[in-house]
Structures are given as C-alpha cells and as structure tokens.
Regions:
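Intracellular alpha-helical coupling/juxtamembrane segments of multi-pass membrane proteins
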Residues: 23-78
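Post-kinase regulatory C-tail/linker adjacent to protein kinase catalytic domains
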Residues: 86-88
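ABC ATP-binding cassette signature C-motif
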Residues: 1-35, 82, 91-306
C-alpha cells in the first residue's frame, strides 16, 4: 500500500505503486477539470458584475450575479498541483508533414560549413531535440528553421497549414513598455485562458505583487520568461525553442515539459537540461561540425545507440 501526503492531508492507497499512480492520475485530472470549469464560471460572473454593476438598467442582474458568486464554494488547488497546471491553446490543424529539409548547408565567411548537406523530415506530433557540442550549429539550425536566418544553401519545404513560433534568449529584447506583466499577458491570452493567467504567471515565477511590475523594470531573465509564456499562448503548431529552460526553476521546468508533452503540435528544441531532454524528446538529431545523424527514438534510445 501507498501513503501520500498531499496538500496537508495524508491519504492511503491500497495496492502497489503502479496502481497508486493510475488512481492518482484519474483523481488529479478530475480535480483539475472541476477547478477549470469553476474558474470559467467565476470569470463570467465577475466580468458581468464589472461591466454592468454601475448601470441602472442592469443593477438588479448584477446584484443577482454577485449573490451567485458569493455562494460558490471555491475549489482550491494545492500549491504543489498549481505548479503543474498549464495548458496550451489548441494548435491550429496542419498536415502530417510539418517540415522537409533538403541539403541544408550553412557556412560563415564562406570558409567553414557549420551545417553540411542536412536532410530531415519532421512529422506532426514529433518532439525533436537537436544535440551536439558547442559550435556544432544547433542554434544556427533553429534560426534557419524559424526563418530568422535566410542566408543558407538548400531547401526548406513547410507542410500545409504550418505556423511557426520561435523562442530564443533574444526574444527578451521585445518585452518593453510601461504595461504591467498581468495586463500584458492578459492582452496576449485567448479569451478562454484569461481566468488562468495568474496561475500561468505563477508557474513562470511571477507570484503575488510581482504581476503588477511594469515590463521596463524587469531583468533580462524575467523578460525572457515573459517572452516564452507569450509564445506558448500563441496559436502556432510548430514550436522552435532554443534553450527554453534558462531562467526557470525546477518546478517551472516541469510545468513547461508537461505542457509541451500535451501540446497538440510539433516541437523542435535545444537544451542543456538532461532531465528536460529525456522527458520530452521523441526523436534526436545529432550535429557534429559538418555532419549529422538522426535517431528515430527518444534520448534514452540515442544514448543506447552510442
């Protein structure tokens, strides 16, 4: 049997650990679904009260909504569960083929081929990690795939309906202005996710009054986290991520990894975080200077092949 301490309560689960994991997963999904449904209801009530509370013609209805709001027994998620509570907007539909690369070659100063005659096919739903030593061309390849670098030889054929979202540390430079963090992210979030913005910001280490900081006063690392969250709220179906776990703590990395595993699109990423790579990858592309090898399995499979 298994005993779990969760949210301050100790609960007993009969059976072995495998049985416990299955039962607990169902319980957590049920709790999260109920929480999300209630948060949506609360948001609708609060929105009506905010918009019509001061209009004489709607005052009675607003008061009735306030009574409904006051009667709600709120579902509380334990802090440990909130840390893993994040969902993407639905990914736009695209075909099975996401990208095909034919003979991609990239050199600097016309002397050295960092990437040489690279061929690659990426299909919908795959999560490709690009690995290799520093200087092997990992970030260069991601810039090419994202369209940021067009100075290369070869051909990139995107699939039907593919919409690319690209993240690198340079994205932080776009986060500026006198808007608060909360207002900025709410302006980027789809309507159905606005009630969950505070939870999302908390998952990315913006908690309490931090959400009222203006963008201009944020550090580079904080701006990078905001840029990443903004991208994750965008309607894309191919995410190209260069070191997305930089500036995240352990729990936030878990948030990101679990969200990406549930993402309805395709992911190409570079990371130095071994746990993140092992937990997320379904396919590996190894780059060495001027060479490449593709492995049709996760990172553990790649390690076994070495």
């Amino acid at each position: 049997e298994v005993y779990e301490l969760f949210g301050g309560d100790l609960k007993r689960y009969p059976g072995n650990f495998t049985h416990y994991e299955k039962v607990r997963e169902v319980e957590l999904k049920t709790l999260i679904a109920a929480y999300e449904q209630q948060q949506q209801e609360i948001h609708h009530l609060e929105d009506f009260i905010r918009r019509f509370g001061y209009k004489a013609t709607k005052a009675a209805q607003a008061q009735e909504r306030q009574k409904q709001l006051d009667k709600i027994v709120r579902i509380e998620l334990p802090e440990s569960l909130k840390k893993i509570h994040f969902k993407f907007p639905p990914a736009p539909h695209c075909g099975k083929l996401v990208l095909r690369l034919n003979g991609i070659t990239k050199s600097y100063d016309g002397i050295k081929n960092v990437i040489n005659n690279l061929d690659l096919t990426l299909e919908n739903g795959e999560r490709l990690v690009v690995v290799g030593r520093n200087g092997a061309g990992k970030s260069t390849l991601l810039r090419i795939l994202s369209g940021e670098d067009k100075n290369f030889v070869g051909e990139i054929i995107p699939g039907s309906g593919v919409q690319i979202g690209y993240f690198s540390q340079d994205n932080a430079e776009t986060i500026k202005g006198s808007t608060s963090i909360l207002d900025y992210i709410e302006s980027k979030a789809p309507t159905e996710l606005i009630p969950k913005v505070r939870d999302m910001l908390g998952a990315f280490l913006f908690r309490g009054d931090d959400v009222f900081k203006t963008l201009d006063v944020l550090s580079g690392g904080e701006k990078s986290r905001i840029a990443l969250l903004q991208l994750l709220l965008s309607p894309v179906n191919l995410l190209v991520l260069d070191e997305p776990t930089n500036h995240l703590d352990m729990h936030s990395k878990d948030v990101l990894m679990n969200a990406l595993k549930d993402f309805g699109g395709t992911v190409i990423f570079v990371s130095h975080d071994r746990g993140f790579i092992e937990g997320l990858s379904t396919k590996v592309l190894e780059l060495t200077p001027g060479k490449f090898r593709e492995f049709p399995g996760d990172y553990k499979y790649y390690q076994e092949c070495l």
